[in-house]
Regions:
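C-terminal engagement/docking regions of AAA+ P-loop ATPases
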Residues: 1, 232-314
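Pre-Walker A (pre-P-loop) alpha-helix and adjacent loop at the N terminus of AAA/AAA+ ATPase modules
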Residues: 2-46
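Conserved alpha-helical scaffold flanking the Walker A/P-loop in AAA+ ATPase domains
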Residues: 27-30, 83-103
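Walker A/P-loop
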Residues: 32-69
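Walker B catalytic acidic pair
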Residues: 42, 105-106, 117
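P-loop (Walker A) phosphate-binding loop of NTP-binding proteins
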Residues: 43, 77, 145
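Canonical AAA+ ATPase core
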Residues: 84-89, 110, 114, 122-198, ...
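Conserved AAA+ ATPase small/helical "lid" subdomain
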Residues: 193-248
Length: 314
């Protein structure tokens, strides 16, 4: 199965439960193929949870969901040791993090200590329960939803955690035709149940094909040029880390696969960078007051960055 067919199967299945959102579904698929984590931000009611839950259903993988609240404890996510009366010994009760796809709903409703419980899993694909490190199933993908910081009762995510999210996707209000189509489907009762359409062997094959995507030295230079510009911009308190460069590399290869190419082009890099960079930079307060946003800075950088030599399929 080629990349476009792979994407089409997911989009067709997802159309049973959501109207529009093709760009978001594509980004979720890129993150899946890159084994990256995704943060979806938006006010309540924009179908964040619906999108993530049903996207997970399209794969033949294990899935767990945890609704995060101010009193959620790290052990509620990772698990605990307990004494078993049956075996007369201590055993581990694994938490919901031991799954292929974890939906962390309203991640910024819970305190930083609990949020940080997911850091090890996001980076090392393992979790430590009472000093014992246990590998998570592979792939492990965290899909988290969050409310805007202007909402009541929310916490900022730690910078270390934000850095581990490959994409941050902001959901906007639906367009007129999309909302009307959604209302019509609700009225007619025509939304359908989403099924698994990508079995594990097909997903494994897709992972392998992504790893075969070629990337030239010129494209690597282009990626470095982009991240360097975030580090030297006087309007920023700090730029992005080398982990971000890796995320751009992985996501660009996944996008090339979905476009049925066996090599990365600059447009692949530019397209994924918009969603990878935006949450990993910090504006100085003076520029925030002036109304400049992270998105403004990233768009400016991507417009200025150039590839010094034309790349090709070689």
């Amino acid at each position: 199965m080629d990349g476009k067919e792979f994407l089409s199967k997911i989009e067709t299945e997802m159309s049973k439960c959501v109207v529009g959102k093709e760009d978001i579904i594509k980004l979720l698929l890129i993150s899946m193929l890159s084994k990256g984590h995704v943060l979806l931000e938006g006010i309540p009611g924009l179908a964040k949870t619906t999108i993530v839950k049903n996207f997970a259903k399209t794969f033949g993988l294990s899935f767990s969901r945890i609704q995060l609240t101010p009193d959620t404890m790290p052990s509620d996510i990772i698990g605990v040791y307990y004494y078993s009366e049956k075996t007369k010994d201590f055993a581990i009760k694994k938490g919901p993090i031991f799954t292929n796809i974890l939906l962390a709903d309203e991640i910024n409703r819970t305190p930083p200590k609990t949020q940080s419980a997911m850091l090890e899993a996001m980076q090392e694909c393992q979790a430590t329960v009472e000093g014992t490190s246990i590998k998570l199933p592979e792939p492990f993908i965290l899909l988290a939803t969050m409310n805007p910081l202007e909402s009541e009762g929310v916490y900022s995510l730690p910078e270390a955690q934000m850095d581990r999210f490959m994409f941050k996707i902001t959901l906007e209000y639906p367009k007129k035709d999309e909302e009307i189509a959604m209302l019509k489907k609700k009225y007619e009762g025509s939304f359908e149940t989403v099924n698994s359409v990508i079995p594990p062997e097909e997903l494994k094959e897709a992972f392998e094909k992504v790893l075969e995507i070629k990337i030239s030295d010129e494209i690597l230079e282009y990626i470095y040029e982009i991240v360097k510009m975030t580090r030297t911009d006087d309007r920023l308190l700090y730029g992005v880390s080398p982990r971000t460069s890796e995320q751009i590399l992985y996501a660009s290869r996944a996008l090339a696969f979905l476009n049925n190419r066996n090599y990365v082009i600059p447009d692949d890099v530019k397209e994924v960078s918009k969603y990878i960079l935006v949450h990993k930079i910090k504006l100085k307060i003076d520029y925030e007051i002036e109304g400049i946003s992270n998105k403004n800075i990233i768009n400016e950088i991507l417009d200025k960055a150039v590839v010094f030599k034309k790349t090709g399929d070689n």
